[in-house]
Amino acid sequence: MINLQNLIRTNIRELISCAETKAEENVRDSQHIMLDANENPYNKPFNRYPSDDQIELKEELAKLKGVRTKEIFLSNGSTEAIDMCYRIFCQPKVDNVVAIEPTCELYRRYAYLNDIEYRSTLLDDDFQLNAAELLDACDKHTKLLWLCSPNTPSGNLLNVEEVEKVLKGFDGIVIIDEAYADFTRLQTFRERISEFPNMIVLNTFSKAWASAAIRLGVVYAQEAIISIFNKVSSPYHISQLTQEQGLDALKHRYDIEDWIKILLLERKRMILAFESLACCEKVYPSNANFFLAKMKEAQSVYDYLCEKGIHVRECSNVSLCGNCLRITIGSKAENAEILGLLRCYKSTK
């Protein structure tokens, strides 16, 4: 059993102890006369601050995902959630975090921004996790472990047994980024938050929910952790427009499911097509809305596509990804366009 209070930064513990609890009678209602927040009475409905607990959106999300509202925190994109993990748990210049490599670069970026030592352990050639190696990289100052499953840029799910070893073998917080989990039909760790009091699961409306523009991230964890996020978050950090668009997406979840089915079919078609391209050496298995392809001349192919107005991610400078491109699954028309161009590609050698 982890001691959550010992993991939290001292100044954050002091902030939480001083946090004011809003009395139930002071809950704001649109039917009330509200003269407490120095708002302008004109330009309704945009003159009022948004709901600070986002309860309507959380209730709909909880029903869909099979969790309680007290196990959900909504963030201004996943980036805010990542940053908050550092600010809540990691003491600058003292603590460190350990992540897998390669993975999402945001974990490293926000470690640097918060002056936290960032360590990493290399995945194997199949982009799989070795729990023992990850845990060996930890010391008494390691507060967070970062896992991403499905991972980026590789696209694969991490081995469940190895992830479980990490969760059971680490006394700090294990963060599992499941931004792309909606593209797999397998069980997610979000469904298992009751098992692991030291686990935080991240998700987002940017990927499967096709709502990147509204900047809405989701944190799932046991209530003890979520209550900390609630107490230290910025006030009114989720705009009313974002909350409304999030609710609208949830109401149209059957459309989302149809889009996912189409994307999964397109992913299968694209991978098969890439495997037959003369310029492609290998395509790695994917459980996301993208795939990683090892090319014979990645930089040349990348430049060629850019000249034609098609943007992909060049990954040659990423560990284990030499000569690789990461390709997002687009619409059928977009996918046909890139395949047509690559079939016409001429080697520069």
Task: Name each model feature, range by range.
Residues 58-96, 114:
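Phosphate-binding glycine-rich loop
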Residues 1-63:
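N-terminal "arm"/small-domain region of PLP-dependent enzymes with the aminotransferase-like
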Residues 263-264, 276-308:
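Conserved PLP-binding catalytic core of the aspartate aminotransferase-like
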Residues 161, 307-308, 317-349:
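PLP-dependent enzyme catalytic core of the Aspartate aminotransferase-like
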Residues 4-7, 91-147:
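PLP-dependent aminotransferase-like
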